Each structure stands twice: as C-alpha cells, then as structure tokens.
C-alpha cells in the first residue's frame, strides 16, 4: 500500500486528504480529515450506461456512525438504522453542488458514499464531507468538471469567520455554507439573524474567495493520485431529427406556452408533443421515442427561455419582477391552536400550529451530542397538489429539505423559552403547487404562529427568484413558477423580515453567475418580500393577545430546589398522583422551576395549591387542620401537610387528664392542631388543646 497524502491549512484547521490505503476496490476512496473529524468518501461509477436511459442516476449516501463519537447506538438492535434528518440534509447539501458538474448526456450510474468515522464535537462533518467528495470525484476518472470547494461562514462582531467551531456558531449571527468551483458559486445554504442583503452577499463572496485554497489543493492531489479519465464522449446530436422535431413542434409549443393556467397549458403541451411523435412515427417507424422526448424537452426549454430573454411576458403573462396574486387567511380551522391558508397564484399552503409542553420538544441524539428542539416545522407535499397520483407515506428527502429551509426562515424570530415556555410544531400541507412551495410555507408559518398567539418578533415572508441567462443577456425573475425553475439557470430562495434576511438558499446550474446578478436578485427579492409582508399584515399584523382555548396553558411557579424530591415522591409516586388526579402536565427543573400545563384553569389552580402544600414549611405557632394517621400509647401522629406529620403528646390532647388516647381520638379523624415546636431534626410537636384555646380566644 502506497498512501498519497495532501495536507493544507484551512481557516482554523488542518485538512488532510489521503488515498491508496482504504477501500481500494472503489473507483476512488479518500479519507478526509479536518482536525479530529474524519470521513471516508467512496465513489463508484458503472462503466456502461443503461440503454435508453435519459437521466443521470447519481446517488449520494451520507451516514454517521455512532462509534465516531465513542457511542453505542440506542434502541433494541443497537445499530444504526434509517438516515436521520441531519443525515438526509447533509446528503442533499453534498448532492446539490456536485450534480451540475457532471456533463450533459452522461447517464452512467454513480454512487457516492460518505461515512463519518471520527468526529470532533467542535467541528461539524458537513464541510469536510463536501471537500472529501470533491477530492474523490476528482481522482476517480469519472467525467466531472471539478474540483469543488466548500466553506462555512459565520458573522461574529461584524466580521466574517471562516469555518467557525460549534461554540463560535452559538454567538454567530450567520451560519452559511457556500460551495463552488474556481470561477463560480454553485450552491448556498444559510440561516441568519435578519442580516442586511449586503452582508449576506458579502458572506457568499467571502466564502467563495476563501475556498480557493481547497480547490487548488484538490487539483494538486488529483495530479498526484488521479486515475486515467474515462473514455467517454457525449452523445452526438441527430441534427436531422432535431430539425424535424423543431419543424413539427416549435410553433405549437410557443402557442401552448401562451396559456396561463397550468393544467390547461400542460394538456396542450401534451397534445403538441403527441402530434409530433405521431408524425415522426408515420415517417419512420424505427424512430427512438426516448430521443424524441429529450429533443422535445430541449425545444420546450428553448421556446420559454427565448421569450423571456426577448422581453416578452412570462408563461403566466407577468413581468419579470411581478409577484402572483396573493390570498391570505388566518384562523381557518376551528380546533387547531393556530392556522393559516396562504395562496400565491397556483401555489397554496395550509399551515397549522400546535402548542405543547417542554416534554413535547424533539430530542435529538446525534454524533455531535444531544440537543432539544422546541420549534419543529414539517412540510408535506402530497401528489394531489400537482394533480397526480402517487405514494403517500414517510417524508422524502425533498420534503425534509424544504421543511428545514422554511424552519431556517422562521427560527430567527421565534421567542425564547423564557418568553414563551411552549414547544411549537408547525405543519405545512402543500395543497396546490406551481413553484416556490417552500417559501409559501414560510409565509403560512408566520401567519399560523401569529394566529396561535406565539409572540414572534415580526412577520416573515419568503420568495423564490429565478434566472434566465443567454450569453451576456440575463433576466432575473421574481416568484418563479415550477416551469421557470425547471427551465431556468438558478433557483434563489430568500426568506426574511422587513429588516433583513433570515434564510438564503441558492442552486445555480451554470457558470457565469456574477456578483452583480446576485445583487440584483437580492434587491428584487427584497421588493417582492415587502410586497408580500404588506398583504400578510392586512390579514394579521401581530400575534394574538392570547393563545387558543384549545391549547394547554402553562403556568410557571418557583419552589425551593430542595423540595423537588418531595414533589416527585418515592419512585415518582407523588407527581404521578398529582398529574393523574388533576389532569395536568407537570414539569420540574433543577433550579426549582415548576411548569404546570392544562387547558382547564381549575385543574391548574388545584395542582398549584397541592404543590404549594407539599413544598410549604411548617410554621411554629400556626394552626393547621390535620388528620390522625397513627395512634400510640403516648399520643397520636397527625398529618398536617402532604408528607409532614407531627406528634400530639397525650398531655396535649385535652385540658382534662387523658388515660387512653383511643378514648379521645380515632384513625382518620380530622383535628385542629397548633404547631408548638420544630426541633433540629425536623420533628414537629403539635397540640390540640392549645389550638382549642387559641380558637376560643379568637371568638
């Protein structure tokens, strides 16, 4: 074994790339390290493409092994299972920038597997996974227009920070990941604390500049360790067939794309394509219909893009900077804690908000440690939203990714646990879709949270921008349709408030996207965002003054931390009885904070009364109503507070001489007693006759 190693400094860390020792039967394998965080990246590609395949089957699998953090998995089987949400999101983060770097027409199956084998709790594994993937693809010989660089950018005390640690991110106003080639930014994913557009743009430029050291190092690594390039050539276009398809379908497609209603347009496009195929089959029964489908798709793209570049109206008749018609409704469902229906053109989201207690929060145990997520946002994309049939079940990668993007857009305005002691779950059901459903989810979530009475700092809206670029000519599009996303060169999603950006996601399919284009897109997005916020604020401009009658109300009280064990009781018996008998949910914290949750005010008050009884101290000289719980020869034990008993000596039962305690008292008898003394050991001395004397004096 002859290892080839490349090391370089990158921000605060040393990055090492190594190949030639592990997984030598893969087309490429790289052990990539950043500090103590290490990933094994393998790449395997099939040498032959499946006949007739018209798509590129790229699979990216990212897996975190618990042994990397010195842990044993939980659960019955004690081994890793299905991918977690974090693993799915990082797999998408790696997939998005590498996919456009494979050549058009390349349909060989390629699988990339990233395995986290060691983790430093201060260095997240996503950036080194992207770097390792870029290096493995670069040396594999598979056609790939890399290398690719990746960087995380923070913003702390007004300065950009390259690859901040986990601790630094806690005080950062920005968490941005940018990936790109030497000359172009390809992907951006970020979460921010309502930062100005110029700060966001600056962070993208900064991250791209800093990652040049990665790109250079991988190029040097490839020169030393690279395998011979595959003998692959792009399929040659059948120019005669291209001309025939153009003649048969171009005019029909141009007319079909004048139809503004999506379903009607799709129906007419299908008619035009079917007629073209029928004519081609009549002329040549051996024509390859898959090839024809590809050519029709390319022609469709050319027709739509040409109209936009020429300054003609968009597919639905809008100008480039126009937002589709908006409909905003809050409080649309009677029993949910909060709800909203947000409609933008043919995209619609029904969003609900549910409030719960702290124990309803999501508990995540990952290789980076345990954490609790009080705010959850789930995005569902059922097939009926686009007029199709399909499988319904667990969320797909796309749904998880869109939900996380919407979560990032909203998280910056969420209240702290001290301000609002509830767990919050939002669900966005996409009921119609024609582009930008994730940004519709952001808008709907903001509305539903306000309807639920969640004190978010301000309204948040999201908008998806697009781009069509031909040579030096380009047009930036606001509020793109699904077709414009599919046929365009950029998908640029921005969520934010009136004051700044809270989330930015960008996927670019071509090179040549300049800082000027990104700046125009951000400014155009700001105008669209403010327009949407104005409409949203007309429906509900601030959060409701109170939460729903159907939501649990959380009341917080403080007790002496030393009394927590009394509230819990032996084996949890006391708190279990409290919750069952009052119908409340009770949560205790180590500092003595007690949170009582119930939708019934009387139940809450009863729980508070009983907790105060349990935790109150016995006061010398005070009169208590108690119950006889045990009789002995020398007196009786009386319970005066939950868990607090005292002794009434035989001499303190009556002013008369008492020969036999049982002649005066019986078990479970209610008596009035006065506390005479509490000794150093906490023993309580009670008196019935002193209590009677005090009561008589009071009368």
UniProtKB/Swiss-Prot annotation:
List of residues binding Mg(2+): 485, 491
Gene: pnp
RNA-binding listed as a keyword: yes
Annotated protein name in UniProt: Polyribonucleotide nucleotidyltransferase
EC numbers on record: 2.7.7.8
Keyword Cytoplasm in annotation: yes
Subunit-level organization: Component of the RNA degradosome, which is a multiprotein complex involved in RNA processing and mRNA degradation.
GO molecular function annotations of the record: 3'-5'-RNA exonuclease activity; magnesium ion binding; polyribonucleotide nucleotidyltransferase activity; RNA binding
Domain named KH: residues: 552-611
Keywords: Cytoplasm, Magnesium, Metal-binding, Nucleotidyltransferase, RNA-binding, Transferase
One family name in Pfam for this protein: RNase_PH
Compartments (UniProt record): Cytoplasm
Domain annotation S1 motif: ranges: 621-689
Domain of life: Bacteria
Gene Ontology CC terms: cytosol
Native source species: Shewanella sp. (strain ANA-3)
Catalytic activity: RNA(n+1) + phosphate = RNA(n) + a ribonucleoside 5'-diphosphate
């Amino acid at each position: 074994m002859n290892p080839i190693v490349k090391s370089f400094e990158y921000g605060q860390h040393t990055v090492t790339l190594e190949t030639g020792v592990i997984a030598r039967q893969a087309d490429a394998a790289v052990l990539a390290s950043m500090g103590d965080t290490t990933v094994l990246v393998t790449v395997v590609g099939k040498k032959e493409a499946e006949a007739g395949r018209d798509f590129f089957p790229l699979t990216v699998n990212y897996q975190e092994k618990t042994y990397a953090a010195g842990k044993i998995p939980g659960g019955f089987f004690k081994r890793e299972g299905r991918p977690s949400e974090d693993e799915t999101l990082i797999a998408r983060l790696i997939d998005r920038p590498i996919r456009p770097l494979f050549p058009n027409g390349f349909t060989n199956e390629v699988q990339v597997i990233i395995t986290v084998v060691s983790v430093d709790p201060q260095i997240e594994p996503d950036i080194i996974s992207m770097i390792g993937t870029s290096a493995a693809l670069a040396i594999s010989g598979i056609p790939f227009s890399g290398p690719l660089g990746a960087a995380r950018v923070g913003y702390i005390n007004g300065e950009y920070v390259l690859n901040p640690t986990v601790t630094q991110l806690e005080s950062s106003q920005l968490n941005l990941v940018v990936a790109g080639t030497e000359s172009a930014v390809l992907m951006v994913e970020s979460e921010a604390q309502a930062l100005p557009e110029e700060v966001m743009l600056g962070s993208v430029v900064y991250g791209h500049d800093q990652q040049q050291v990665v790109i250079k190092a991988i190029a040097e690594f490839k020169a030393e360790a690279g395998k011979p390039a595959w003998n692959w050539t792009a399929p040659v276009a059948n120019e005669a067939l291209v001309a025939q398809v153009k003649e048969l379908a171009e005019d029909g497609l141009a007319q079909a794309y004048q139809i503004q209603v999506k379903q009607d347009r799709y129906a007419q496009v299908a008619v035009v394509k079917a007629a073209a195929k029928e004519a081609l089959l009549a002329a040549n029964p051996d024509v390859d219909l898959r090839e024809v489908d590809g050519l029709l798709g390319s022609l469709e793209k050319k027709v739509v893009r040409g109209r936009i570049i020429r300054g003609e109206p968009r597919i639905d008749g809008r100008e480039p900077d126009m937002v589709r018609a908006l409909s905003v409704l809050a409080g649309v469902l009677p029993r949910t804690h909060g709800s909203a229906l947000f409609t933008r053109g043919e995209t619609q989201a029904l969003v609900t908000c549910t409030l719960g207690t702290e124990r309803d929060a999501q508990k995540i145990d990952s290789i980076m440690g345990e954490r609790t997520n009080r705010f959850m946002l789930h995005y569902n994309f059922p097939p009926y939203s686009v007029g199709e049939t399909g499988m319904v079940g667990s969320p797909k990668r796309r749904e998880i990714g869109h939900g996380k993007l919407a979560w990032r857009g909203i998280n910056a305005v969420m209240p702290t646990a001290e301000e609002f002691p509830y767990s919050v779950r939002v669900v966005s059901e996409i009921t119609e879709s024609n582009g930008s459903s994730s940004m519709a989810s952001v808008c709907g979530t903001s509305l539903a949270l306000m309807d639920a009475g969640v004190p978010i700092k301000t309204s948040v809206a999201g908008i998806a921008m697009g781009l069509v670029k031909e040579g030096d000519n380009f047009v930036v599009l606001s509020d793109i349709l699904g077709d414009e996303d599919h046929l365009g060169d950029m998908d640029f999603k921005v969520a934010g408030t009136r004051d700044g950006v809270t989330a930015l996601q960008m996927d670019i399919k071509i090179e040549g996207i300049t800082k000027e284009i990104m700046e125009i897109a951000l400014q155009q997005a700001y105008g669209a965002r403010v327009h949407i916020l104005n409409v949203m604020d007309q429906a509900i401009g601030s959060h409701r003054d109170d939460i729903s009658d159907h939501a649990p109300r959380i009341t917080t009280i403080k007790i002496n931390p030393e009394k927590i064990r009394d509230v819990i009781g032996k084996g949890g018996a006391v708190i279990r009885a409290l919750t069952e008998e009052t119908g409340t949910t009770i949560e205790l914290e180590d500092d003595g904070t007690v949170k009582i949750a119930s939708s019934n005010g009387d139940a809450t008050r009863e729980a508070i009364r009983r907790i105060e009884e349990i935790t109150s101290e016995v006061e010398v000289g005070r009169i208590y109503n108690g119950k006889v719980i045990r009789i002995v020869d020398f007196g009786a034990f009386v319970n005066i507070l939950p868990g607090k008993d005292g002794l009434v000596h035989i001499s303190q039962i009556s002013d008369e001489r008492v020969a036999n305690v049982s002649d005066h008292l019986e078990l479970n008898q209610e008596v009035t007693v006065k506390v005479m003394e509490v000794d150093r050991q906490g023993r309580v001395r009670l008196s019935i006759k002193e209590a009677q004397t005090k009561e008589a004096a009071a009368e």
